[in-house]
């Protein structure tokens, strides 16, 4: 063994550990989890109960509903991986597997991200990024779709929460 061999083995392991650590964050940002947990939290506040149900229950409900919503995307991704015969045994196959899984996720994000938010992130990239990189950017790139989707979900969640609050305010006024 050469002295450089352990470092060569360490880098892919380090990349894998970092990628595994980012999976929960990515899962929250590219699913409806954020919207669901915000709506449930606002509903709890509108009811006037601060601790019932507990946050763990709200998060559990949000996870279950998010898995239900994302099931077709997951099924499509698994079918694509099976069709291509990818097992993820080496780094090249792992990269191909990520690309195969990213396509159904991209379609989901494109369907649910508002056009206004996608344009906002394209314009922001043009203002902040180097010009040659910003010109290559399209509105269906994951780097644009993920934050646009998250912002769209937040907007929808607060609109839903506002409607819930209005309903409870009307009930309070009628009862008073």
Language model: regions and residue ranges:
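Hydrophobic alpha-helical segments and their helix-loop boundaries in membrane
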Residues: 1-176
């Amino acid at each position: 063994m050469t002295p450089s061999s352990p470092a060569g083995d360490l880098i892919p392991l380090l990349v894998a550990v970092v990628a595994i650590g980012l999976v929960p964050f990515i899962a929250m940002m590219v699913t409806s989890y954020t919207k669901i947990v915000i709506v449930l939290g606002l509903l709890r506040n509108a009811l006037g109960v601060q601790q019932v149900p507990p946050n763990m229950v709200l998060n559990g409900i949000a996870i279950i509903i998010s898995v239900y919503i994302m099931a077709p995307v997951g099924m499509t991704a698994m079918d694509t991986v099976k069709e291509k015969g990818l097992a993820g045994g080496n780094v090249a196959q792992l990269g191909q597997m990520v690309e195969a899984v990213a396509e159904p996720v991209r379609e989901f994000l494109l369907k649910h991200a508002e056009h206004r938010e996608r344009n906002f992130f394209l314009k922001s990239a043009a203002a902040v990024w180097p010009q040659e990189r910003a010109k290559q950017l399209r509105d269906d790139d994951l780097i644009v779709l993920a934050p646009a989707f998250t912002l769209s979900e937040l907007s929808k969640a607060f609109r839903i929460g506002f409607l819930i609050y209005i309903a409870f305010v009307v009930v309070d006024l009628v009862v008073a």
